[in-house]
Amino acid sequence: MTSKLDQLKKFTTVVADTGDFGAIKSLEPEDATTNPSLLLKAASDVNNAQMLADAFSGAKGDIGLACDRFAVAIGQEILKVVPGRVSTEVDARLSFDTNALIERSERLIGLYDAAGIKRDRVLIKLAATWEGIRAAEKLEKDGIQTNLTLLFSFAQAIACAEAGVFLISPFVGRIYDWYKKSSGTDYVGAEDPGVQSVTRIYNYYKANDFKTVVMGASFRNLNQIEQLAGCDRLTISTDLLKKLAEDTGTLERKLAPGNAGEARQSLTESQFRWASNEDAMATEKLAEGIRQFARDQEKLEALLSAKA
């Protein structure tokens, strides 16, 4: 019998949301994504102790650079076991500074360049703030492809498409979490607000021939993944990937080009900020996500500082 994971791979590019090389190798995803939380977990693994030490020793006391070196080292190892791309995230504390985001992105891609990794195998992850989207627009023009993350609203999706970013990561599970907590309702299937958000974005992009890739992220259960089967890409935790690999039930494609979508829109900065302000869920989850990634970045810096 064919597993649901293998069925999913027929119409969706499967991406592993982890820094665990062993798990990636066994599950055979096309790509992999990392973030500060996953890097912190990897840094705490004794098997990566030498990698952490090397990152610090090569940074000459610059802890920020040491963190970037470690992120790229993890990315290099991941690229040994996936045929596609790895996403490496910029320090979340820079999320509201366009120039700083560009500079840090250029440093990350420079480290990959120095390691002999081709740019078409790396995506630089930026939070989908207005400043992050503007940074991504410039980076894309300079040949550095981006993954806009912490995406919770249709306004963010509109702005990312207009900026010509390579890929967006709408967060299914965190949207679901907010609405479940707010309403007390345990949403299932097509009624899940996170599923509805990604479906709307996917249909809008396809209807208007945007080339930006839609990669659903942050899943809480298998049903959310199944409801988005057919999405360009889905980045999935190893636990859920294993469950998909063990399930031999039938998986039907839910998303496909050709479905009805809304007319093309564009947003000025003030319109973007107003739309964000009016969306309580998106405002709260974006701020929360940036804070969480910033705290984990600080913990990673503390681990590296301890080696001084």
Curated annotation (Swiss-Prot):
A single GO molecular function term of this UniProt record: transaldolase activity
Record has RNA-binding as a keyword: no
PROSITE patterns in the record: TRANSALDOLASE_1, TRANSALDOLASE_2
InterPro entries according to UniProt: Aldolase_TIM (IPR013785), TAL/FSA (IPR001585), Transaldolase_1 (IPR004730), Transaldolase_AS (IPR018225)
Annotated EC: 2.2.1.2
Gene3D superfamilies named in the record: Aldolase class I (3.20.20.70)
Pfam families: TAL_FSA
GO CC terms, sorted: cytosol
Pathway assignment: Carbohydrate degradation; pentose phosphate pathway; D-glyceraldehyde 3-phosphate and beta-D-fructose 6-phosphate from D-ribose 5-phosphate and D-xylulose 5-phosphate (non-oxidative stage): step 2/3
Record-linked NCBIfam families: PRK12346.1, talAB
Listed name of the protein: Transaldolase
Species in which this protein is naturally found: Pseudomonas savastanoi pv. phaseolicola (strain 1448A / Race 6) (Pseudomonas syringae pv. phaseolicola (strain 1448A / Race 6))
